[in-house]
Amino acid sequence: MSKSLGNFFTVRDISKEYDLQVLRFFMLSAHYRNPINFSHDLMEAAKNGLDRIITAVTNLTHLEKSAKDSAMTEDEKKVIDSTKDIYGKFEAAMDDDFNTADAISAVFELVKLANSNSSEDNTKEYITALKESIVTLADILGLKVIKEEELLDEDIEALIACLLYTS
């Protein structure tokens, strides 16, 4: 791609089709020293990967609301202990010349661990620990994986009305 050939994209062009979080994830998928070949297929793959992480965190958030408030079981503690190994892989990848592609694979390991080892029967402490482990590593990479609740237009209008009447 080159500007003189006219076969390039600006961030503004890409943002019309994709969320900028997807672009960030796409760029993190490759080593910073290597050139990145842009294609819509690769952007779709990045979108799917990011959606997979967001879905895992969203599912854990829903489980967290209905989880029981008791102490972690021994099996749950073993799973949480295994996250420390994944943290080590993440840290090693980042120490290896900022290898974000390998760091992302560590995040996907956590997602796989969370998806296969979480259910409505787990404790709140356990579900929260799994969720926080994914969110923490994603946050280090600059990825926002917790979905913000959007306010509806009527809610916004009601809040504005409250502010106007209290002033």
Give the role of each language-model region.
Residues 2, 6-167:
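Structural preference for alpha-helix termini/caps and helix-kink/transition segments
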